[in-house]
Amino acid sequence: KPYSADHVTAPVLKEWGPVRTVVSISHRFAGSLVEQDIVFYPNLPRIDFVTRADWRDHHVLLRVYFPARINATKAAYEIQFGNVERETTSNHSWDTAKFEVCAHKWADLSENGLGLSLLNDCKYGHSIKDGEMGLTLIKSGTYPNENADIGFHEFTYSIYPHKGRWQEARTVEMAYDLNSPLVSALAPAKGPGGFWSKVSVDQPCCFVEMMKKAEDGNGYILRIYENRNTRTSMTVNLGFEISHVEEC
């Protein structure tokens, strides 16, 4: 049975500055409390929902929905080292039974000229049906651990409206930015700064997903993938000397 989180406090303006604007709200459902900071950026076309939940209920599936009003029969979902398209309509009984499907950092619904990406930093149960995008936030099941989701949760999900389809809109890069945010640090002034990377590639559709020491201790292993299903040539730049390269 669906329930709406109707006990919502009036929005409070928490921050208002040149970097971002933050509006805070809280929702109460049964014995649980969910607090959210909704973050708007002047120079970033993304809205973040920084969420903190003190969850005390069992057998309640907490979900969020965004009515997208986008005309598309297929949606794209990120999987490991790529993406997959799935239907947005239910034509068979097994489609109806799949109230959600798995995706990693993003899911996207696009039509010609525009689209909406739903990003997250740790939630993987998605649904996109009839123009509505949903994301499962807390499951609160009781098996095998009867108190698996009881306690404090902190996570962020975002909406990213964009022009064109997700490939041109840099949805993948935006999802990586959410999951690996920029970290700043103060350091003594020592002249002009510079840029150095141990490994980089020169194509925006290619990602260095992993770098590790070889198990025999002789060299490094790189895992690089192309994320837009396009043919491309790339150059791998290494910040150290190498003797030879092997393709695994």
What do these predicted regions represent?
Residues 1-248:
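C-terminal (or distal) subdomains of carbohydrate-active enzymes
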